Amino acid sequence: MAESAPRGFGRGGRGGRGRGRGRRGAKRDEEKEWVPVTKLGRLVKAGKIKSIEEIYLYSLPIKEYQIVDYFLPRLNDEVMKVVPVQKQTRAGQRTRFKAFVVIGDSDGHVGLGIKCAKEVATAIRGAIIMGKLSIMPIRRGYWGTALGDPHTVPVKVSGKCGSVTVRLVPAPRGAGLVAAPVTKRFLQLAGIEDCYTQSRGSTKTLGNFVKAAFAAASLTYGILTPNLWAERPFGQTPIEEYADILMQTEKKY
């Protein structure tokens, strides 16, 4: 009598089908190589731009989130809230999910992403990408004597969204973050260690609350304190400087 095949193998077994699905799924999980589609992305991948501060200096728009991943690999994200939103249609109410995500490296860079999608996971994934595209530098300063590393906001700044107003006030070293949980987590991801905050309005609306905090923190980079008054030579933008290289790379892509 012929020996029977092991269970799960051979014709009619279930083992082969499971292994086949695993191999197909592994290909989907493989990371694809980044192929830049913008001029800024091609310069970044070619190594012509050394830091993300050069992009901010010339106010170049970031259209690819991979540029942020290239310069800031240690970004952390925090899902602040996911709320269902509805839209009335002829077929009835269409429910979608709106995600608010704050992303930052705790070292002077923070972004806010908001995205709506039919599924929660898709909304969070899209909000993370939007947060990377909207990432902004945060200028830090001192409360008193300039000793050690910058630890607080350089000046008083305010941000407003809807009825919510958030004010950030410099604090002495060791004071910590005197803020609501939403603003506190936002400032932690921004890299601010000590800060007093004031908030007014309907702070229960978390979306407007975190938007106002982001608007206030973004203003710190637009204020020049006396130590930044020195004149600096302002040359061509990287896109103008490396125009010849961009013409060559366009043919490759």
Swiss-Prot record:
PROSITE patterns, per database record: RIBOSOMAL_S5 (PS00585), S5_DSRBD (PS50881)
Residue ranges constituting the S5 DRBM domain according to the UniProt record: 75-138
UniProt cross-references to InterPro entries, sorted A to Z: Ribosomal_Su5_D2-typ_SF, Ribosomal_uS5, Ribosomal_uS5_C, Ribosomal_uS5_euk/arc, Ribosomal_uS5_N, Ribosomal_uS5_N_CS, Ribsml_uS5_D2-typ_fold_subgr
UniProt main location, coarse: cytoplasm
Gene3D superfamilies given in the database record: 3.30.160.20, 3.30.230.10
Region (Disordered), start-end ranges: 1-30
Bias kind Basic residues: ranges: 14-26
A biological process term (GO) from this entry: cytoplasmic translation
Assigned GO CC terms: cytosol; cytosolic small ribosomal subunit; small-subunit processome
A GO molecular-function descriptor: RNA binding
Localisation per UniProt entry: Cytoplasm
Keywords recorded for this protein, A-Z: Cytoplasm, Ribonucleoprotein, Ribosomal protein
One Pfam family it belongs to: Ribosomal_S5_C
Role this protein plays: Component of the ribosome, a large ribonucleoprotein complex responsible for the synthesis of proteins in the cell. The small ribosomal subunit (SSU) binds messenger RNAs (mRNAs) and translates the encoded message by selecting cognate aminoacyl-transfer RNA (tRNA) molecules. The large subunit (LSU) contains the ribosomal catalytic site termed the peptidyl transferase center (PTC), which catalyzes the formation of peptide bonds, thereby polymerizing the amino acids delivered by tRNAs into a polypeptide chain.
UniProt subunit comment: Component of the small ribosomal subunit (SSU). Mature yeast ribosomes consist of a small (40S) and a large (60S) subunit. The 40S small subunit contains 1 molecule of ribosomal RNA (18S rRNA) and at least 33 different proteins. The large 60S subunit contains 3 rRNA molecules (25S, 5.8S and 5S rRNA) and at least 46 different proteins. Interacts with snoRNA U3. Interacts with MPP10. Component of the ribosomal small subunit (SSU) processome composed of at least 40 protein subunits and snoRNA U3.
Family the entry assigns: Belongs to the universal ribosomal protein uS5 family.
Protein name: Small ribosomal subunit protein uS5
Native source species: Schizosaccharomyces pombe (strain 972 / ATCC 24843)
